[in-house]
Amino acid sequence: MSSPKSLAAVPTYNDGMPYPEMFVAPMRQELTDLGVRELRTPADVDAAVTGTAGTLMIVVNSVCGCAAGKARPGIALALRNHVKPAVVATVFAGADVEATDRARHYFAGYRPSSPSIALMRDGKVVYMLERSQIENRDALSIASELTAAFEKFCAAPITT
């Protein structure tokens, strides 16, 4: 009898092998063409989280349909807003497995999901849009929610 899979397991291709780069490259490019910085290693993730002054947005990109038709187009629309995060970065679930695991380490209290979008300040999540909040919405609705989050968390220092 096999053991149940961990909740932290990320979707992969071919019995745990990461998705082939030629398969995910166009999906990566949708975000990098917007100026989104790729975080391909755990060290890249750590550097972004600890080295960003202001708000950091980390997108957990994915091969799924809701990433293609909803999350990435919603992000593209939201990034047209005049107020946005100081740094926008991405990891790719199922491709950059270790980098994605490291990003999820910083998302304490949230279940692993892809796609998902986190806004962080001082190494802590201040806003999270999870897959369950993406998959039944359109890109305009996602963009609207993201721009509201940008206005709240990126426009001025957060006071607690």
Q: Which sequence ranges carry the predicted segments?
A:
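N-terminal leader/targeting and pre-domain segments
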Residues: 2-54, 154-158
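Structural signal for conserved beta-strand scaffold positions within catalytic alpha/beta enzyme cores
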Residues: 40, 90-92, 119
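Thiol-based oxidoreductase modules, predominantly thioredoxin-like and allied folds used
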Residues: 60, 83-102
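Typically the conserved alpha-helix immediately C-terminal to a functionally engaged Cys/Sec
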Residues: 68-81
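Short, charge-rich binding segments
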Residues: 80-82, 107-111, 118
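Short acidic (Asp/Glu) patches
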Residues: 97-114
